[in-house]
């Protein structure tokens, strides 16, 4: 019994030390922010939280061989380069050699009719200690008329029920981001659920990924 308690104490101490150790920073050379930043004004949020706001769609690539947790922010600017609004920062997990599409919303949740571009900056980038408990598997994309459809399985590999924000990124033939729809998925421990997103007219590529997770 004493031996078992000693081992348990060692494991708890090791886990606590692991949490206390600062996360490794990602070298700037290991990240690439997309040159195409698309400005949109549309409905954001769900149900009673839905509202019209201006946002910027931009891709970030993890060029390294390890996962990265990346936070982007920025400002909206008018045709003269003057700031007309700030963008709320967003954090996403990016797999090795992977890409994620960010949707940075005006931090006052307001339409900005004068906004024609955005200046994007990296607010933070670290190497996560663990893989996320919810992941995407069996991703498929196919053409449906003048758009594409993306499907996948959302898999909870943990022993606890989770709630995950599942998103999709759709791009046009030139690689510009077009839309980033999302849905909130409650998913039980060890369960997988199908996800399906339909891209906008003119979309040629699409993919599904996981955003915020709460378990």
Language model regions located:
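Intrinsically disordered, low-complexity Pro/Gly/Ser/Thr-rich segments with frequent PxxP/GP/PP motifs
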Residues: 84-111, 178-203
């Amino acid at each position: 019994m004493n031996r078992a308690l000693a081992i348990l104490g060692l494991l708890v101490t090791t886990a606590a030390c692991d949490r206390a150790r600062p996360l490794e920073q990602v070298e700037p050379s290991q990240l690439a922010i997309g040159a195409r930043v698309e400005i949109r004004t549309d409905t954001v949020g769900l149900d009673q939280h839905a509202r019209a706001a201006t946002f910027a769609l931009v891709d970030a690539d993890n060029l390294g061989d390890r996962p990265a947790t990346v936070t982007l922010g920025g400002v909206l600017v008018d045709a003269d380069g003057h700031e007309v609004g700030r963008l709320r920062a967003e954090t996403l997990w990016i797999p090795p050699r992977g890409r994620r599409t960010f949707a940075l919303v005006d931090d006052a949740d307001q339409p900005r009719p004068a906004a024609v571009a955005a200046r994007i900056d990296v607010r933070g980038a670290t190497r996560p200690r663990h893989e996320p408990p919810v992941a995407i598997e069996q991703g498929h994309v196919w053409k449906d008329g003048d758009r594409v459809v993306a499907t996948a399985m959302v898999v909870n590999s943990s022993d606890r029920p989770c709630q995950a924000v599942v998103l999709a990124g759709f791009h046009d033939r030139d690689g510009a981001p077009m839309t980033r729809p999302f849905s909130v998925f409650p998913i039980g421990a060890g369960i997988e659920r199908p996800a399906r997103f339909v891209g906008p007219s003119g979309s040629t590529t699409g993919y599904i990924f996981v955003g915020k997770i709460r378990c």
